[in-house]
A protein has these predicted regions:
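Acidic-glycine-rich active-site phosphate/pyrophosphate-binding loop
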Residues: 17-36
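Thiamine diphosphate
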Residues: 4-5, 13, 32-176
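Charge-patterned, long linear interaction tracts outside catalytic cores
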Residues: 179-180
Length: 180
């Protein structure tokens, strides 16, 4: 299974949740699979989808928030695991699609192949950290706990067009959803 398949599977369990998606190919694949106003596509700022997701979860405690991240971005911003744990938003599910590669820059290896990301976040203090194949994602999202999910896939990018919405329009339509 590749990242695009993982995103399709994830989106089958998404209803009205707010989704913050990692930069590059993951954002383009999500846009191609299930574009909607509740999706915020990162166009830049590698490593910060988790931080933006945390901010949205804290600002909108009545809404469920799902972050779709990559292993490269996760490793780039490991400090976000500590901040997220300490803030402990019970409406946030942080999914890291681990392809052991920087998919958007040419599939160079990350160090994720030497690590267990679930063990890392458990070491920080996360009490609800899972491998995707061991859970029902809908149940995890519905649970009122901060959760982390690692989704292991093979490297590779699908042939998808660029996102045809400007960054300003992505922000405007997402903010409109937030302000409802």
């Amino acid at each position: 299974m590749q990242r695009r398949d993982a995103i399709k599977n994830i989106m089958k369990d998404i209803d009205d949740e707010l989704v913050i998606c990692n930069i590059g190919f993951p954002a383009k694949e999500l846009h191609d699979i299930a574009d909607r106003a509740e999706n915020f596509y990162m166009i830049g700022s590698m490593g910060l989808a988790s931080s933006i997701g945390l901010g949205v979860a804290l600002a909108k405690p009545d809404k469920k928030v799902v972050v779709i991240d990559g292993d490269g971005s996760f490793l780039m911003n490991l400090g976000a695991t500590v901040t997220t744990f300490v803030q402990n938003p019970n409406n946030l599910t942080w999914i890291v699609i681990n392809n052991e590669a920087y998919g958007s820059t040419g599939n160079q290896d990350t160090y994720a192949k030497y690590l267990d990301l679930v063990d890392i976040v458990k070491g920080v203090g996360f009490k609800h950290a899972y491998n995707y194949e061991d859970i029902d994602l809908r149940e995890v999202i519905d649970d009122d706990n901060l959760s982390f999910v690692e989704y292991n896939v093979y490297p590779g990018n699908s042939q998808v067009p660029i996102i045809d919405i400007s960054p300003i329009e992505i922000k405007k339509r997402f903010m409109k959803v937030l302000n409802k």
